[in-house]
Swiss-Prot record:
GO terms for cellular component: cytosolic small ribosomal subunit. InterPro entries: KH_dom (IPR004087), KH_dom-like_a/b (IPR015946), KH_dom_type_2 (IPR004044), KH_sf_prok-type (IPR009019), Ribosomal_S3_C_sf (IPR036419), Ribosomal_uS3_bac-typ (IPR005704), Ribosomal_uS3_C (IPR001351), Ribosomal_uS3_CS (IPR018280). Keywords: Ribonucleoprotein, Ribosomal protein, RNA-binding, rRNA-binding. One of its GO terms (molecular function) is rRNA binding. This is Small ribosomal subunit protein uS3.
Length: 233
């Protein structure tokens, strides 16, 4: 029986970048890794309603730089940047080093697998029919320019006694093509019947030229709190 490899892990260093960008000695590596995990867990819990896509952590010269990709930058930044400052102080306590926080806006949340899977799980928890939630997400992604999308849900669908899985796909999703830019995410919906797993694959097109092309295209619209306030005015 064939198994599917993780689409993001398979493409790391080819067309995908790491979420933690730092190098450490053997004695410091475990501490840095544990620190990164705690920072991510803290941010995902604190910013649960801010539609967080991913968190990039860099460690330049005894400090830490955290870039938060979100569909709702206003919620993260808060009034006059108050919330960002609270986050900075909390992360500094966790890591024990000076912290810089950057906010990057996700322009098209319909094409972000993490945000799509979170959207479907929230609908399932609100008792929306799973087929309707899947179809709506697929149609929104295709409307925004996705080359293909596949959504799979598994568990006690509709409260059935026997767990099963169903999937819905539009367009093409070439999992074996390494140059294919496929965004993948998994989420869990906690319903009264039990846990329902949601997997999302989104094919955005092919990237030719490897990591050089990715570096050139993936320069984020990172905003400090001052820039955000200036742009908002």
């Amino acid at each position: 029986m064939g198994q599917k490899v993780h689409p993001n892990g398979m493409r790391l260093g080819i067309i995908k970048k790491w979420n933690s960008v730092w190098f450490a000695n053997t004695k410091d590596f475990a501490d840095h890794l544990d620190s990164d995990y705690k920072v991510r867990q803290f941010l995902m819990k604190t910013l649960e309603k801010a539609s967080i896509s991913r968190i990039i952590i860099e460690r330049p010269a005894k400090s830490i730089r955290v870039t938060i990709y979100t569909a709702r930058p206003g919620i993260v930044i808060g009034k006059k940047g108050e919330d960002v400052e609270k986050l900075r102080i909390s992360i500094a306590k966790i890591t024990g080093v000076p912290v810089q926080i950057n906010i990057s806006e996700v322009r098209k949340p319909e094409l972000d697998a993490k945000l799509v899977s979170d959207s479907i799980t929230s609908q399932l928890e609100r008792r929306v029919m799973f087929r309707r939630a899947m179809k709506r997400s697929v149609q929104n992604a295709m409307r925004q320019g996705a080359k293909g999308i596949k959504v799979e849900v598994s568990g006690r669908l509709g409260g059935a006694e026997i767990a099963r899985r169903e999937w819905y796909r539009e367009g093409r999703v070439p999992l074996h093509t390494l140059r294919a830019n496929i965004d993948y995410s998994i989420s869990e919906a906690h319903t009264t019947y039990g846990v329902i797993g949601v997997k999302v694959w989104i094919f955005k097109g092919e990237i030719l030229g490897g990591m050089e092309t990715v570096e050139r295209l993936d320069k984020p619209s990172v905003q400090t709190k001052k820039q955000y306030r200036k742009n908002r005015k």
